[in-house]
Amino acid sequence: MSTQHSGDKLWGGRFSEPTDAFVEAFTASVSFDQRLYRHDIQGSKAHARMLARVGVLTEEECDKIHDGLDAILADIERGDFAWSVELEDVHMNVEARLIERIGDVGKKLHTGRSRNDQVATDIRLYLREAIDALMQEIRRLQGGLVDLAEREAQTIMPGFTHLQTAQPVTFGHHMMAWYEMLERDHGRLADCRKRVNVLPLGAAALAGTPYPLDRHYTAELLGFDAVTDNSLDAVSDRDFAIEFCAAGALIMTHLSRFSEELILWASAQFGFVDLPDRFCTGSSIMPQKKNPDVPELVRGKTGRANGNLIALLTLMKGQPLAYNKDNQEDKEPLFDTVDTLAGSLRAFADMVPHIQVRAEVMRAAASRGFATATDLADYLVRRGMPFRDAHEVVGRAVRHGVETGKDLAEMSLDELRKFSKTIEQDVFEVLTLEGSVAARNVHGGTAPAQVRARIRAARAKLMPAKG
């Protein structure tokens, strides 16, 4: 049975009875938005400094507010701050404690602002900081991939399409593919950050404020590149959070695909790589097991990131302007995506440099499955045969190989000439794995020379991050 909770609200003047206790708990967000305490205090200090600049506060009042906020920050970080559900959210908790500490001067802090523009500012400050940290983790992971690619620039493995052997590639080339995907992920976060880094503070509830606020000065204090140009838009939209979650879902999708490969490659059926013991776990019943828990969890956590994106899109799709209480539900999906990305990127950045490659196993796998069939077709084309005819000839040679249990390089010259008289002894030069990868010496190709060129370019890009 619901009860009513008495207690003063900072907005309580309009109401004739206290809030129902269940409703109070149901509508409170402090259990999760307290994460924003540093950003809330940072924004409040800048707001107070701006109010002093325009004459709404005296310098003495501003200093008193700053001292009070600094003391509250210290209390929170020591664990000495009692968060109150009755005060609903991080903003009201901090403001109430400020008034308790410094008296009526604290009541002036909220002049010219609303919780609507306040929370939008807090989220942007938080997300900007999170993006910067995530971009650094991406760079760290990319650095590990580049090191691994350089170490294995000439290591031959089977390249796959449809999870069937397709053509030989180098392991270094394969690692650089993941580098390139992460490079686009890094770029998407950098681009998203531009739209995050716009200040909504000063939009107030929805219509702006009659006070002579200097929004550009506040933006300068907080490191924002610009201020919002429409007060309704400033407080009501969360497209910047949706954009971040979309970029996050793509990052997790890339990590999930990479995870799937590592899980397969580490299995006894592939045996291509060995993952470090410290990134794996065992079985409670099967003593032989070494389970790739880190990539499996990253693969699984991708569902969270995808779900958070859909949650935010669904949250926003039916809202009229301007702010609605629905937007309280924006934080948990956003926070969860940040946490999921941070943990997954850290796990991969820590693990990748220590992956052990079983080069001989990969080479043996590449020598099976007719991986050089395309090379034979190209050989025939260079001797004047139309490609479609060459494709047909090689297809028949492959069928013969399947029937006899021989790979193309294992067939005799006489056997190969049964399919085309244009085949000569030099064909065996193109049917080697080394010859196949070396022939792909086009920009972006798998030839070791091209892989090393991409590694040099990547290192040049990563160098500022390492400096």
Curated annotation (Swiss-Prot):
The keyword Cytoplasm applies. Keywords: Amino-acid biosynthesis, Arginine biosynthesis, Cytoplasm, Lyase. Coiled coil: none annotated. Its main location: cytoplasm. Pathway: Amino-acid biosynthesis; L-arginine biosynthesis; L-arginine from L-ornithine and carbamoyl phosphate: step 3/3. Its EC number is 4.3.2.1. GO terms for cellular component: cytosol. It catalyses: 2-(N(omega)-L-arginino)succinate = fumarate + L-arginine. It is found in: Cytoplasm. One of its GO terms (biological process) is arginine biosynthetic process via ornithine. InterPro entries: Arg_succ_lyase_C, Argininosuccinate_lyase, Fumarase/histidase_N, Fumarate_lyase_CS, Fumarate_lyase_fam, Fumarate_lyase_N, L-Aspartase-like. It comes from the Bacteria. GO terms for molecular function: argininosuccinate lyase activity. The keyword Cytoplasm applies. It holds the Pfam family ASL_C2. Belongs to the lyase 1 family. Argininosuccinate lyase subfamily. This is Argininosuccinate lyase. It comes from Thioalkalivibrio sulfidiphilus (strain HL-EbGR7).
